Amino acid sequence: MKIDTFIFLMFISIGILLLLLNIINPMEVFHIVEWKTIFSLFYLMVIINIMRDTKFLDYISLKILKKSKRIFIALIFLTLFLSSLITNDVSLFVIIPLTLIIHRYTNMPFKDLEKLIIFEGVSANIGSGLTPIGNPQNLFLFHFYNIGTLEFIINMIPFEIFGILAILPFLEFKKYDTKINIDIKFKKEWIFYILSFILVLLCVFGYLNFIYILPLILAILMYKRVKVDYLFLLTFIFLFVDIEGLKRIGIINIFSIKCGNVMLMIYASLLSQIISNVPATVLLSHLYKNWLPIAYGVNIGGNGTLIASFANLITLRLSNGNVRVGRFLLIGGIIYIMHLIVLVAYAKIFWV
């Protein structure tokens, strides 16, 4: 069993146990779950995955890459950009396979390929921290704390800037000889998916009711074979059940410590290393009123251990054996520590 599947099933099992023990009545689940977050994730998964499956994301990526010989840097910044718009997980499903294809048409050494794939994983975690739709934890915080879109992005800019500065010294700026002869022609069906994506964004940001475009999403699922990670969605639903159950039996208070904003950021980042950043986000949001230290902490904490972020597991899974686990942990750990130290210094100066 894959480690991410094991983690998902563990959280689901805890929720089922809480229901069986009648700590939570099954009828209460509807009111406990943050359905805005669930529907946001579901809609984004459907639209973004179909854009990926129909090669629209490959089309955009290749258009950008064909204009650059500095493939290493181009792919890293493409990852940073895409992960802020289409989530860190999906961006990796586009970028890493594309990287492996492009590698065949370059003179890039395998050690640089390994380094590139690792930093694509790291960059996906950093880039996704900028926007409410960049990753599941941001999407949850966005709805749970009722944060404005612009407010969220402006507050996360320092996180993004210092994250990019942390990885820059390690990147390869040299040029590689490239002969990218892959050609993808524009498809008319993409226009429909682009418009659907815009409608989904309007829902996520509160301009449209989620019910209005549910028929559209269901129609797409009926007529197209779209891969949706239903296990992840189910896990997210049960996370709300888990947290409510732990709150009722008093265990959640174990995770509550008296701390200021800077210490909360550090705490959130460390907790993410142990239980992964999505569960850490849901847990801490029920204990603390200030969203920003949690957002910084869980996004910093995405890099480091394998389970810190699901994006880390995806990076290794997609690398086709080109990445050593030890090397991945070393680089991820170094970036985590550097990013945390710099943001602690920033927070001590600018946070009240």
Curated annotation (Swiss-Prot):
A cellular component annotation (GO) from this entry: plasma membrane
Residue ranges of the TM segments: 6-26, 30-50, 76-96, 151-171, 197-217, 226-246, 291-311, 330-350
One GO BP annotation of this record: transmembrane transport
Pfam families linked to this entry: CitMHS
Keyword field contains Protein transport: no
Membrane topology category: Multi-pass membrane protein
Keywords from the UniProt entry: Cell membrane, Membrane, Transmembrane, Transmembrane helix, Transport
InterPro entries: Cit_transptr-like_dom
Compartments in which it is found: Cell membrane
Similarity comment: Belongs to the CitM (TC 2.A.11) transporter family.
Record's protein name: Uncharacterized transporter MJ0456
Organism: Methanocaldococcus jannaschii (strain ATCC 43067 / DSM 2661 / JAL-1 / JCM 10045 / NBRC 100440) (Methanococcus jannaschii)
